[in-house]
């Protein structure tokens, strides 16, 4: 949506390099994964239209081609010197790019998988949010993450202590990701709250997070101090954000490449009571996003103190 890519011709605008700088994440990682005789450079990011403080590092479907190699490197990097540059390369690329644009916060939109790329991104992050839908699959995902994340944490701690990885061109960073919270999204509201069918799933998610997920995270040091959550103004066992389905607004948002709450009446192409209803929804969505943002900012400020 941000890039406005409509066909193969426009998609070429984020392929390869420009003036020696990579144009997407895969090209940015290529020096490490393809053993090129050059160091990783900052990616040439795209500025988000209408926001001079927001930049996008384009993704690339070809990043999946590095998944197997990265997985091998993360399992055997302690003994295979030839692979030692890979585990630390992703965070190095992110830091290098962030520094070139004076970026304060980096948000990573991860795919719903438990592969090596996500393991690496998670293990080298500072905070993580878990998106959920009020459905069966998310309730199962809670149990899956309860077992997987502690294992990833143990691997990351071991990797950070390996001399081989610390002597690499891109040293593996010592990080301890902390649970920032979770988001429940895409439910159908009725009278401003989830309908009874969706509320049943929301209740199950809250129960799973509070009684299964969070205790497991506490045991392996993946939770922030209780005082930090209090400073943020929320309980980590409750959703930091509950976001209803955007319905028809999302189509207009994508068409005009603006957030749903910034769509104008002309862009909505509606009149009368239909327009009033859409604008009321826009105001509600904006309020929800702002409240969640304030919670996150207060929490990060409390961490920095």
Where do the PLM segments sit?
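P-loop NTP-binding core
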Residues: 1-305
């Amino acid at each position: 949506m941000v890039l406005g890519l409509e066909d193969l011709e426009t998609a070429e605008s984020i392929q390869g390099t420009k003036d020696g700088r990579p144009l997407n994440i895969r090209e940015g990682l290529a020096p490490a994964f393809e053993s090129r005789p050059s160091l990783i450079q900052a990616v040439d990011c795209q500025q988000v239209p209408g926001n001079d403080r927001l930049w996008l590092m384009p993704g690339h479907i070809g990043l999946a081609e590095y998944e197997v190699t990265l997985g091998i490197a993360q399992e055997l990097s302690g003994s295979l010197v030839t692979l030692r540059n890979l585990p630390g390369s992703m965070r190095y690329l992110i830091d290098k790019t962030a520094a070139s644009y004076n970026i304060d916060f980096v948000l990573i939109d991860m795919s719903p998988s438990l592969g090596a790329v996500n393991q690496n991104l998670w293990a080298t992050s500072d905070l993580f949010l878990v998106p959920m839908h009020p459905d069966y699959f998310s309730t199962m995902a809670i149990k899956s993450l309860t077992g997987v994340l502690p294992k990833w944490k143990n691997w990351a701690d071991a990797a950070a202590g390996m001399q081989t990885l610390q002597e690499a061109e891109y040293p593996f960073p010592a990080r301890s990701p902390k649970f920032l919270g979770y988001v429940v999204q895409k439910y159908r509201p009725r009278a401003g709250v989830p309908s009874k069918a969706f509320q049943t799933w929301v209740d199950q998610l809250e129960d799973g997070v509070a009684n299964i997920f969070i205790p497991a995270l506490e045991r392996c040091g993946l939770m922030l101090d209780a005082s930090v959550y209090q400073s943020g103004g929320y309980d980590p066992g409750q959703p930091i954000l509950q976001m209803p389905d955007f319905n028809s607004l999302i189509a207009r948002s994508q068409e005009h490449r603006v957030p749903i709450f910034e769509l104008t009446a002309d862009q909505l192409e509606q009149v009368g009571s239909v327009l009033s209803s859409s604008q009321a929804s826009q105001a509600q969505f904006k309020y929800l996003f702002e409240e969640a943002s304030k919670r996150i900012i207060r929490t990060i400020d409390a961490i920095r103190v």
